[in-house]
Amino acid sequence: MKYQLTATEARVIGCLLEKQVTTPEQYPLSVNAVTLACNQKSNREPVLNLSEHDVQDHLDALVKRHYLRTVSGFGNRVTKYEQRFCNSEFGDLKFSSAEVAIVTTLLLRGAQTPGELRSRASRMHEFSDMQEVEQTLENLASREDGPFVMRLPREPGKRESRFMHLFSGDVETLVNVAEAVSPVEDESLAARVDALETEVAELKQRLDSLLAHLGE
């Protein structure tokens, strides 16, 4: 998997994707608007408290990696940002509106069931029924240029399996971790996965910092 986003990078991109669809009149977003979106209490898991400085650092890094681009001029006093993560003119990653809604909601809230995704992604795409949600997830999991999502083992006592995005790690690692924790009944699988994602993100940031230092 060529995408390796940290947890905060996933939040930033998810916010830009969300606002592009739900509030197009306010898009692209300034660093202040991105910060407010990242720290938003609704439709976010976990709720963050990022500083504008932190968000600016992540925006700069994502611009360098060509996931975002800056927009200035034409009466804009401040630099604004728009996503180039998917469906951009020169990018290879193309998603349908249903796929954008699912991917965005997973980036913003982590692993969720198809039922939760249908409800939470409804502002971005009106799914006709659960079959459309499940078909969209299947498409994202089986695409030749993916996979972009995976189904987690069902938690004990739960009726539905959850799905998670794969933009922050490779399939094999996540599958092995999911299989390792699936028999454990006394701990929440969600907490274990969230902790893993945070650890991977922190390790990647430390590696990026080390590589940058070595390159000086």
UniProtKB/Swiss-Prot annotation:
Family: Belongs to the UPF0502 family.
HAMAP family the record matches: UPF0502
Name recorded for this polypeptide: UPF0502 protein Ent638_1581
Protein source organism: Enterobacter sp. (strain 638)
